[in-house]
Structure formats: structure tokens, C-alpha cells
Regions:
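Short beta-strand scaffold positions
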Residues: 11, 45-46, 84, 106, ...
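Acidic, PIN/NYN-like endoribonuclease modules and their adjacent C-terminal/linker elements
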Residues: 1-8, 112, 117-148
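Short acidic, glycine/proline-enriched helix-loop-strand junctions
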Residues: 73-87, 99-100, 107, 131-148
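Active-site neighborhoods of divalent-metal-dependent phosphate/nucleic-acid chemistry enzymes
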Residues: 82-122
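Helix-adjacent hinge/juxtasegments
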Residues: 56-84
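Short active-site oxyanion
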Residues: 40-44, 79-81, 119-121
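Short, well-structured N-terminal submotif of metal-dependent ribonuclease cores
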Residues: 1-46, 59-69, 142-148
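Amphipathic alpha-helical segments within well-ordered protein domains
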Residues: 17, 52-56, 94
Length: 148
């Protein structure tokens, strides 16, 4: 995914959970992508719904301490993550939700609507639904398949 400094990438829960969880099979690709984006001074747009979903998932899968640590890192002033309110994008997200596969969540549709708003197809996430809907996602690890 080649990007310019002006073009943001939109964060999805899948990559943020992988980034915060060292035992996640996509931790290394998420960390590598985040490092490249940071070195390029690339902004990562963080939809507020994605922040909430990420903290909920981390709190349930790991613990509240892990979730709070992730929230602190994502919301740290000066970080590459830019928190954005999503209320004004709900109608566009609901239209996508109506038109896309049952496997696509409303939060995924919000991520896509935010990407459309920022005129980007780049998603900082691993879900194949993004690719199927015409967006570019991070390349997931194949290590878990090789270990099976």
C-alpha cells in the first residue's frame, strides 16, 4: 500500500487488537505496518466507534489493564492516531450496511464511510470484507495456517 503524507489510513478494530496483543497471529504485520506509517508521518484516522469496539474486545479477550493501556496509547497527544467523531457518517454507513454482505458489521461500514469521506481506500485492518468491498487492507499473517 503506497501512500502519500496527505493521504490518511483508517483504523479498524482488527489491526488495533492485533497491535495490542503480542500473542495475536497478526501482531507482527500490524506492528510492522504501524512502524512504517509512523516513520512516514502517516496519519491514522481512528473512528470513535472503532476505539470503543477495540477497548471492548481487548477488555474481554485480555483484561481491562490491557484495554486501558491500548486506549492510553491510541489517545496519547502527538500520536499518529487522530480520533474522529462518526455521527455525521452514520447514514452513509447504514446504506453500506444495507447493501453489503451479512458478514459485514456496522462498525466495518462506518470505517468504509470514513474512508470515503477522506477519499482513501486504505484501511489499517485485516478483515477480508474491506477488500471485497473495494478497499485495501493489511496483508494478514499466514503463520497460523503454517502452524496448524
Amino acid at each position: 500500500m503506497e501512500r502519500t503524507a496527505e493521504q490518511p489510513i483508517i483504523a479498524d478494530t482488527s489491526a488495533l487488537v492485533s497491535l495490542a496483543t503480542e500473542t495475536d497471529h497478526n501482531h507482527a504485520p500490524a506492528k510492522d505496518a504501524a512502524t512504517k506509517l509512523r516513520e512516514a508521518n502517516q496519519p491514522i484516522i481512528l473512528p470513535s466507534d472503532v476505539l470503543v469496539e477495540t477497548i471492548n474486545v481487548l477488555g474481554k479477550r485480555s483484561c481491562h489493564e490491557t484495554a486501558i493501556k491500548a486506549a492510553d496509547a491510541l489517545l496519547q497527544p502527538g500520536s499518529q492516531f487522530i480520533l474522529v467523531e462518526t455521527t455525521s457518517h452514520i447514514q452513509a454507513a447504514l446504506k453500506k450496511f444495507k447493501d453489503l454482505s451479512q458478514a459485514v458489521s456496522l462498525t466495518d461500514c462506518i470505517v468504509m464511510a470514513i474512508a470515503d469521506h477522506y477519499n482513501t481506500k486504505d484501511i489499517f485492518g485485516f478483515d477480508k470484507q474491506f477488500e471485497e468491498a473495494g478497499y485495501r487492507r493489511l496483508e494478514p499473517s499466514t503463520e497460523w495456517k503454517e502452524a496448524a
